[in-house]
């Protein structure tokens, strides 16, 4: 009875699939309270600060190397960015000035300055900038610990099977997790796009984040179930519930084993129609995971990771090597590269772009590239040079008008002609397309379809722009509705317009891998589904059981419904989805 009384379920956000059952290990946040003291020797205090920064750099360098070996280049880039923070005079100079002018101790000056920057970034109210706040918090916590002589928990020392419970996991915490012992984790804060969630998916560790209260409810040694499928954390489950979850875990593992058999199969519907399943990637390191999960191509190569976590623009040759590597690894399979989508909410400090009131509607992506043409042309040259090494397709992000697309394509053709004049080989017939993520582009799809080779629908932005709802703002997140009939009608309009001109349509937003969305998108005629690598095999298994002709019959009904709830209910009933 004792267990039954103490059993408790907490709800959070399913951040990484799977089920973990193990003893709880609380990753405690050390007391880093920085009391204010007056110092007599200002120079000695600045020297203390610099010594602590140097030690923090040593640790981060070691963690970066560990991440590089275990997780790949893109995850290691997080720590390269942290090292840049510790070299940033905009952070360090105000700390030193505070020590000098106020004659205060280094701990207090660091803490106060960090809090100022953290609150400034958090007030910007978009996920990317909030993650910059998390970077500063992680880095300054490490320096502060050295100043205070406090030891920070090291998850790499765990030597028994556990589920980690923490307020949050910093990137450096997550990079040190050993999969042999850490079976899952649950945190109070965070979302699906936070560093810890991304790392968990990379490590394939079940995770639930954003529970708000898990650290208040769980003690060391409690038996905890982390349900990364449904976003639940069960504390001290009853023997009956524990047995149910053991079965649920076994079913999930068996299902994964069945999915694994589909790795080398093409995606063919029950009535014999081929549908392309592709992967979204950020770096060349991601190709390995894409192929291991049976990707038939790369539907979105986000090139901005090449530009982030560094102090200057990548050179043409650096970019060429990255693009060539991806194309060669994909061995003739299509690779759709999105040109630089940066600016506004995704900052590159070295570009020194002005702060904007509304970065999502501001100077970003193709708008920035058409103005900063030297940077844009460098990327296009690198892509064109790499094109001979595989099946390259190029697409431009955030296109709102025909003029933008025409201008971007004209620049691409100018660079191609210049390379050919120089005797540099460029592939023939490179397809050039665009992202459809702005409602204006979706509405005008019939005109764009005459000039593009393909469309890729970016649902993440298309939904928030159409619904006028920031998906990272909890107060309006209920309006972020992928199944809203307005969104489905736009998607249908884009696909129909493209098909009338003989062009193909892909989708690279999260919606493409959603089990409820898949039958709808098949019904609407989507040609290519591009998703995170781990979603490919479940999607393939689902599509093999669906008949395209049968799915097509629901198109009219789905588009005639009035609410997202009605759409979901209808699709679940029709296709027997849970």
From Swiss-Prot:
Mg(2+) binds at residues 437, 461. It catalyses: L-histidyl-[protein] + phosphoenolpyruvate = N(pros)-phospho-L-histidyl-[protein] + pyruvate. Phosphoenolpyruvate binds at residues 302, 338, 460-461, 471. The gene is ptsI. It is an enzyme of class 2 (transferase). Its EC number is 2.7.3.9. Its cofactor is Mg(2+). It comes from Geobacillus stearothermophilus. One of its GO terms (biological process) is phosphoenolpyruvate-dependent sugar phosphotransferase system. Keywords: Cytoplasm, Kinase, Magnesium, Metal-binding, Phosphotransferase system, Sugar transport, Transferase, Transport. PROSITE patterns: PEP_ENZYMES_2, PEP_ENZYMES_PHOS_SITE. It comes from the Bacteria. Gene3D superfamilies: Phosphoenolpyruvate-binding domains, Phosphohistidine domain, PtsI, HPr-binding domain. Its main location: cytoplasm. Homodimer. Belongs to the PEP-utilizing enzyme family. This is Phosphoenolpyruvate-protein phosphotransferase. The active site is at 195 (tele-phosphohistidine intermediate), 508 (proton donor). The reaction takes place in three steps, mediated by a phosphocarrier histidine residue located on the surface of the central domain. The two first partial reactions are catalyzed at an active site located on the N-terminal domain, and the third partial reaction is catalyzed at an active site located on the C-terminal domain. For catalytic turnover, the central domain swivels from the concave surface of the N-terminal domain to that of the C-terminal domain.
